[in-house]
């Protein structure tokens, strides 16, 4: 569910592959179900559910599938108790990495996460070791839109900031609680985001060289391949020059 921002060039690189897409759908359904179970089926009063639904629709999940996941979560009848865990660690070049998991078995999950870090030249950290480098925000990404009109509509709806990227795409940032309100207002104004999600935004970035870039990509891929992992956030960036050497 990466957006168009400058660090998104190395997030979820395999998202276009069919197998990866299937896993994304499975994880998104799990998030929707859990959000509905914990906060109720009304997205208007449940920001976590609203964000999950928006993210699911942005990757072309059908509304019917979304509604079934909400109904299952609200009913709470699947007998599986899942908890959300966040692990923090360090990747190559000291990159900060946060791993959001949803699991019914902590021991299995932490073992898989630790293995991914150790196999990729990283290390699992302690609680709070890198979390301070990230801020939780809603992101609405638009490939193309009238910048002035979008900015006016977004700020009027309560967005925190609007940024135009080098490629012409536009990112609208919100607080997590205002995400649904801003999304609804922009869609009502005719602006449909290409991607919409609540993410962890790094306050600082680490530029990776040609040696460390593939190591971070390996770490991300290994983590995302774990069934219990929902999201991977990091502050690594790869320049166009270095990216060209990885093709």
Swiss-Prot record:
Give the family, as the similarity comment puts it: Belongs to the TACO1 family.
Originating organism: Tolumonas auensis (strain DSM 9187 / NBRC 110442 / TA 4)
What UniProt keywords are attached to this protein's entry?
A: Cytoplasm, DNA-binding, Transcription, Transcription regulation
State the residue spans of region: Disordered: 1-21
Pfam families the UniProt entry points to: TACO1_YebC_N, Transcrip_reg
Q: Cite the NCBIfam families for this sequence.
A: PRK00110.1 (NF001030), PRK12378.1 (NF009044), YebC/PmpR family DNA-binding transcriptional regulator (TIGR01033)
Name used for this protein in its record = Probable transcriptional regulatory protein Tola_2714
MF-aspect GO terms: DNA binding
The answer to whether the entry has keyword Ubl conjugation is no
Classification of source organism: Bacteria, Pseudomonadati, Pseudomonadota, Gammaproteobacteria, Aeromonadales
List localization entries.
Cytoplasm
Q: Origin, by domain of life?
A: Bacteria
Question: For this chain's UniProt record, which GO biological process terms are given?
Answer: regulation of DNA-templated transcription
Q: Which GO terms describe its cellular component?
A: cytosol
The main location is cytoplasm
Xref: InterPro entries: Integrase-like_N, TACO1_YebC-like_2nd/3rd_dom, TACO1_YebC_N, Transcrip_reg_TACO1-like, Transcrip_reg_TACO1-like_dom3, YebC-like
């Amino acid at each position: 569910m990466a957006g168009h921002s400058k660090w998104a060039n190395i997030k979820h690189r395999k998202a276009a592959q069919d197998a990866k897409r299937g896993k994304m759908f499975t994880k998104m359904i799990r998030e929707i179900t859990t959000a509905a179970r914990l906060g109720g089926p009304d997205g208007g009063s449940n920001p976590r559910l609203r964000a999950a639904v928006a993210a699911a629709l942005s990757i072309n999940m059908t509304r019917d599938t979304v509604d079934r996941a909400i109904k299952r979560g609200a009913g709470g009848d699947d007998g599986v108790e899942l908890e959300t865990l966040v692990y923090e660690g360090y990747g190559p070049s000291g990159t900060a990495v946060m791993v959001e998991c949803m699991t019914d078995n902590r021991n299995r999950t932490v073992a898989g996460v630790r293995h991914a870090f150790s196999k990729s030249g990283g290390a699992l950290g302690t609680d709070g070791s890198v979390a301070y480098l990230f801020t939780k925000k809603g992101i609405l990404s638009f490939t193309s839109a009238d910048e002035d009109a979008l900015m006016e509509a977004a700020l009027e709806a309560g967005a925190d900031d609007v940024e135009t990227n080098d490629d012409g795409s536009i990112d609208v940032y919100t607080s997590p609680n205002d995400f649904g309100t801003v999304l609804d207002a922009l869609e009502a104004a005719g602006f449909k985001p290409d991607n919409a999600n609540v993410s962890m935004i790094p306050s600082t970035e680490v530029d990776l060289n040609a040696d460390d870039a593939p190591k971070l990509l390996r770490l991300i891929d290994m983590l995302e391949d774990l069934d219990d992992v929902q999201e991977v956030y990091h502050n690594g960036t790869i320049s166009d020059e270095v990216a060209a050497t990885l093709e």
